[in-house]
Amino acid sequence: MKNILCCKLFSKLVLLVFFQICLSSVFAQTKMNINENWLYLENNTTNLSDAQQALNWTSINLPHTWNAEDATDLNPGYRRDAGWYQKKLDISQIDKNQRYSLYFEGSNVTTKVYVNGKEAGAHIGGYIGFTIDITTLIKQGNNDIFVRVDNSYDIEIIPSQKSDFFIYGGITRDVWLLSKYKNHIQNLKITTPEVSAKKASLNINALIANSENAKDLSLTVILKNPKGKKVASKTIAVSDKLANIKFENLKNPELWDTEKPNLYSVTAFLSEKNQIRDSANEKVGFRWFEFKDHGPFYLNGKRLLIRGTHRHEEQAGAGAAMTNAQHRADMESIKKMGANFVRLAHYPQDPEIYKACDELGLLVWDELPWCRGGIGNELWQTNTKNMLTEIINQNYNHPSIIIWSLGNEMNWLPDFPDGDNTERTNVFLTELNDIAHKLDPTRKTAIRKYYEGSHIVDVFSPSIWSGWYSGSYKSYQKAIDVYKKEYKHFIHAEYGGDSHVGRHTENPITGEGLIKAEGWEEAIVQTKVANLAKIGDWSENYIVDLFDWHLHVSENDPDFVGNVQWAFKDFATPLRPEDDIPYMNQKGIVDRNGNPKDAYYVFKSYWSNEPFTYIESHTWTERQGPENSPRTLSVFSNCEKVTLFHQGKSLGEKQRNLSLYPANGLTWDVNFLKGENILIAVGKTKDGKTVSDTLKVNYRFNKNDTATSLQLSYQKLKNGNYLVTAIAIDNNNLRCLDYEESVYFQCLKGGKTMKSQGTPTGSESIRMANGKASIEVLPDGINLPIEMTVLNQSFKGEYLKIPVN
C-alpha cells in the first residue's frame, strides 16, 4: 500500500508540473501519456459505487489485459467478463478556455468512463481509438477516473467468438490526456488527387471546432518535404466548421514506395487574432497504385510483386497489451525479412503499427473485424457500420494503407438464425462497400473467402491452403492460375502451416498417396478431410519445403499479384487446445516471442537485400542415419554464390538460381561423420562481399530404440533464470529423436516456471520435438535449491534439484 501511495504522489506531481507549464503558454495544446500508476479491480459489477468501495485493487500500468496468461494456460476457456480501472488525476488549474479529454487508443470490448462519479462517455468496439470529453466534469485539484471495460461474449459486437483468436479484455493500448483551446482543429483529412513522377497535388480538409462561432480565425498549413524543407504554405480565413486548403502543381514529388518510403509533413495552425491556438501534424506520402485486371499489382507505375505476411496483435506474457517498442519490433522484423505488405488480421491495430508501416515502407490491408459469425440483426449491423466508419476516419491519412477489408470468412458458423443467408449478407456487404467508397474513394475494398460476395468488392482472396488443409503444395501454380482467370482483381491471402520448433525428420510426410493432391480449398469442418494438418508431422523442414515451393512459384510468375503468408508470429487461440503447444496456432515463422523459425530464412532468401546465409537447420543439431549415406542439406541465402564446407573441406561452390527448387539450387549431399560435424556456408555477393553461417551437427549411425525414461538437465541463462530440459532416452542412453509425446513440467520448490507463455520454452505442457522439451524457470530469490519434475502418462515423474548460488 505504501508503494501505491508513493506512485500516486509522484503521478500527482508530474501532472501538476505538466499543466502549469502548458497553461502558462499562449499556445496551450497538450497531449500527455497517462499509462502509469493505475489501479485494477477484477470485478464485474455494473455499479460504480461498488467499485469505489472495493478494497482489492491492484497497482498496474497500461497497456493491460486480464487475459495475459489465462488465454494460454491449461484450463479450458478464458476470462470474458468485466473489470475496472481507476486513476487519480490532480489538475492544479482549470482554464475555462480549454477543452479536456481522454483519448483511448483501444479498450476491449465495451467501455464506460466515469469522472468524479459521473458517466463521461462510452464506446463499443475494442480495436479502434475513441475520445471522451471530460471538460465539464473535471475540477481543480483531485479528479477520480473510473473505467469499466467488458469483454463478455456479446453477439451484437464483432468479432464473433468463433474467430480463431482470443478477444483480450482490458485497456490494451495507450491512454492520453488531451487539452486543447476551445477553438481547435478536430481532424485533418488529407488526399492526393493527382500524383505522378513529375507533379502532385495535395488537398487538406480541416474540421474545426468553433463552438462560439468566432469570426477572426485563420488556418495556416505548411508542407515540408522528407528532408524538412518547406515546399508550400498557405493561410486562409476560417468561416465554417470545414476549411479546405489545396496545394497544386507540386513539382517532382519524392514518391512513397516500399523501398523509399518518403514522407512529407503537413502542419496546420489555427490562429485567433493572430495568436496560434492549436496545431495538428500529419505525415503524407505521394503514391498511386493499381490492380491490373487479371494481372499484377502496380505501385507508382511499376510492377510490384506483393510479398506479404499477416500480423496478430499479441506477445508472449503480454497478450494484446503490448508496448510500442514491442509493436515496432514486430514490424521491423517483418521488414528485415524483406516483406513489402502486411495484412492486419483480423482487426485494426495499434497506432504504432500504422506509423511503423508508413515509415518502413509496408503496404497495409486494414481489416474490419467481421470474422465469422455470419450476418446479425439491426443492432449488430449498426455496430458494424459504425466500426467501419471509425476505422476509415481514424486511419485515413496513412499512405501505407491501400485496402479496406470488409471481412474474413464472414458467413462461416453463423451466430444468428439465418445468419448465413447469402442474399441478406450480400445486401449488407454492399452497404459496407458503399460506406467505404463514400468515406474513401481512393482505396480498394476487399474480402477473403466469401465467394458469394466476391463481385461486390474491388479485390478478392479465395482460400488456397495447398499442402496443409487440402492437397499438395505442388498444386499451387494450378490454383493461382484458376483464380487469376476467375477474379478480376485476385490476391492470395493466407497460406502456410503449423511447425513445432525443433521438430525435424529426414523424410517429412508430404501426403503422397494419402491425400488428394489437387485440392487446395479449406473445409469449414475438418473431421472428414484428409490433409497434412491432420496427418503431417508439423516438422520445421516440411514447412520450409512448403514455403520454398510457394515462393518458387510466386517469384517466377510474371502475372501474379502476390501472396500473403499466414501468419508472421505464433498466436494464441481458444480453438486449438490439442496443438503441440496447447491453445497456440503455430503457423508463425517466428515464435510468440518473435524468435525466427527456419521458415523465416526461406522468406528472407527470396525477399531481403541484406546478404546472409542460413544452413538448415540450427534447431536440428542431433541427427542419425546409416553410415556412408549422404544427406541432402539446404542453404538459404540471397547471395549470388555459396560454398559449403564440411570439416574444413569445400563441397563446392554453387550459383543461386531462382528457377531451381529447393533452396534455389543451393543444396549439397553431405556424408556426415560420426560425432561432431562442422558445416560452414560462405556466401559471396555480386560486389564481392562475403557472409557466412556455421552449424555444428552431432551425428550417429545407430538408430534409437523405444523411449524408456525422461532425463532432466539444466543450464543457467544470462538473465539469471534456468533452462530446464527434458529428453527422452532409450535403454542405450540414446536420445529418442522420434519421440513426440506431451510432457508436463512442474516446479515443486525454489522458484516458478515461465508457464502460459505459448512459446517453446514457456509452456508447462508441450509435445516433445525430436525427443526434447524445455522450460524456463525463475528462482524465487532466497537461494534455496529449485526442485523440478517432468512427467507424462508413460513416465510417472523424473526429478531434478538445481543448486542456486
Regions inferred by a protein language model and the residue ranges of each:
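Extended acidic/polar, glycine-enriched regions
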Residues: K139-N142, N205, A209-K292
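Accessory beta-strand-rich segments of carbohydrate-active enzymes
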Residues: M32-I34, L39-N43, N75, R80-N187, ...
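Beta-strand-rich binding/interaction modules
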Residues: V115, K199-I236, A243, R631-E653, ...
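Accessory carbohydrate-binding/adhesion or oligomerization-edge regions at the termini
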Residues: S24, A28-D73, D144-R148, D154, ...
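Beta-strand-rich structural segments
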Residues: I204-I208, V266-F269, L633-S637, S713-Y714, ...
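Short, hydrophobic beta-strand segments
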Residues: I134, K246-W256, T667-L673, E764-G781
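Extended substrate-binding grooves/exosites of carbohydrate-active enzymes
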Residues: L62-E69, S152-I155, D164, K182, ...
